[in-house]
């Protein structure tokens, strides 16, 4: 008798494990963007694939492309299972505001910059899911609410912009259609050939919270974003002088 393939056997990653994978990928990405981009050793060709020169910088940035989809997926799960959606949204907005000066310094060396950090994108994605649920039975209100959110994302010029907000909403809407979510979702963002690999840990998600349970641990995870950006800014300033 043939054994049927059981996908649940491979679902071994908790939400906390995916958070740590996403965090590591994000930090690597930002190390590449902030420090390695100017480092000669990181831009030497290691090998070539289809006439494309692969460097350490390219590898680090490619790994970094996996972070955002995982964070978006975690956001949709948090939205579904949080005890208070209002508090969840407030926390996202709070850390968007906290992260803005570190983001501005890292990108321009100034306290004010033309684009906004990714927490604003996550917050707007949260609002998109919120109004999608609130106005399920009122298509007109849903349309104009979502339209307003997308316009705000364009005006704010938040990281990943309206495409990022749309990606979050798509993941939420396709939560019960894994194959469509993974294949179509990878085409939402740039470099779909790389982004598709971010759905590997997502597919391995076992719907368990994991070890990040307490409030201090949760806020420490949030704080890792502005803190590491600020650290990278100071390192870059010390090494490169800008």
Which sequence ranges carry the predicted segments?
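Alpha-helical transmembrane segments and their immediate juxtamembrane cytosolic regions
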Residues: 1-242
